[in-house]
């Protein structure tokens, strides 16, 4: 196998965002240089707001809470306990296949949620994974995606809402979306689902896409 998975910390060990960002950048440089294999980092963050490159001033926390600016795509979001974070640092087999990469990330998360009876899906024009409007509420986001590809190697990744508190989203315009809500796997099922509960299934589903996504150590990027 050319893909590895590394756990940086799950509850009760929450990972500081800056530390995870430093690990990402160091690992990214090694993968670009061929000094480390493509690796997916799995973790839970300590609570933090992060702002992607498209974030506008009016979307920032209403109470003035500090925000970490990052170089991923997308807008403002929150990370914290109860969210499974996955940062794939992958040498892409097809450098032009960014849309395919995003769709595969979505497919992994949709498959994991299906195990719990959650009908998660894509919604045209909206990033991430969603539960469509029903008797329980409007369209609601259950997982976010924000990535960057530099020198053919991916950074940043996905956040799956498992059991996290939704109150922090009330202080921001999450991902720039004003006409939809946010939810968690626990809220949709009525069960307590933690990041540690789904991490192994996430790995299993991700491995199904390894051959299509990841360049072998000996292979040149297309």
Curated annotation (Swiss-Prot):
Keyword DNA-binding attached: no
Gene3D superfamilies named among the record's database cross-references: Bira Bifunctional Protein, Domain 2
UniProt binding sites for substrate: 72-79, 144-146, 157-159
Disulfide bonds: none
Pfam families (alphabetical): LplA-B_cat
Homology family: Belongs to the LipB family.
Name of this protein: Octanoyltransferase
Organism: Pseudarthrobacter chlorophenolicus (strain ATCC 700700 / DSM 12829 / CIP 107037 / JCM 12360 / KCTC 9906 / NCIMB 13794 / A6)
Lineage: Bacteria, Bacillati, Actinomycetota, Actinomycetes, Micrococcales
